[in-house]
Design a protein with these regions (language model features):
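Long, positively charged binding patches that form subdomain-scale interaction surfaces
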Residues: 132-236
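Protein-protein interaction interfaces in oligomeric scaffolds
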Residues: 1-126, 130-133, 137, 141
Length: 237
């Protein structure tokens, strides 16, 4: 029920890859980081009860074809059946794969700079990133993942295997997005962790509160489920 599938291609190039002397375990840190980033991104863009994961479908030299799956847990399926409503997964596998690759491409584009700014643009339904005289449009899913500490840090580790002698570059492809990073750009890529948000747009959300607890100073800690919560401050009108 509500299972979707996409393909991610990750390919490492360089003399050690070409001549077959590179051990696959030297590429494992980047591949595992990609899996971590996917897991964190899925928690941000999909509700509780929707899981995501990778599996290796083909491996040849430095090229890996990865199956990306998004599915509802058994408990979530039963809850949906009991409610009589099965809503579409907000971010299915294909879109999730595109968002993940888009985050990697954004980190490369920023070149390690910290003076860039995000602004929400309703006309494109996403965000515009400005760095000096350069501009880039990114999706809302990519913006959410990039801004998250855990997802952003995991994406930075995708470049880890480029520190291996004889590995010159890594390429990552989804159906609609592409990312390629040379070893010479690794340091700047890993520095791109945070940028400012500049936007006057007001975004309205309707949320279902799971539970709430009082904190000090008229603050309320509101839980929206296992992975999502926020702090609100009560004020007199």
């Amino acid at each position: 029920m509500q299972e979707s599938h996409a393909v991610l291609v990750v390919e490492f190039t360089g003399p050690s890859v070409s001549d077959g002397t590179l051990c696959t375990d030297r590429l494992a840190p980047s591949l595992l980081a990609l899996s971590d980033a996917l897991r964190f991104l899925n928690r941000l863009v999909n509700p509780d009860g929707v899981e995501a994961g990778l599996s290796v479908t083909k491996a040849e030299g430095g090229r890996f074809e990865l199956g990306l799956w998004v599915w509802r847990t058994f408990e979530n399926q039963i809850a949906c059946l009991a409610d009589g409503v099965v809503d579409p997964v907000p971010c299915p596998a294909g879109l999730l794969a595109d968002c993940l690759v888009e985050i990697l491409a954004l980190k490369k584009w920023l070149e390690g700079g910290t003076d860039a700014a995000f602004a929400f643009n309703p006309a494109i339904g996403g965000f515009e990133v400005t760095a000096g005289d350069r501009r880039l449009a990114v999706s809302g899913g990519a913006w959410i993942g990039f801004r998250d500490d855990e997802c952003g840090a995991a994406c930075s580790r995708v470049a880890a295997s480029l520190s291996t002698p004889g590995v010159d570059a890594v390429l990552c492809l989804s159906q609609n997005r592409a990312f390629e990073l040379a070893a010479s750009g690794r340091a700047a890529f890993e520095r791109s962790l945070f940028v400012r948000q500049l936007t006057d747009a007001v975004m309205t959300f309707t949320v279902l509160v799971d539970s709430a607890g009082m904190l000090e100073g008229r603050r309320i800690r509101v839980s929206l489920g296992e992975h999502h919560s926020f702090t609100a401050v009560m004020k007199d009108d």
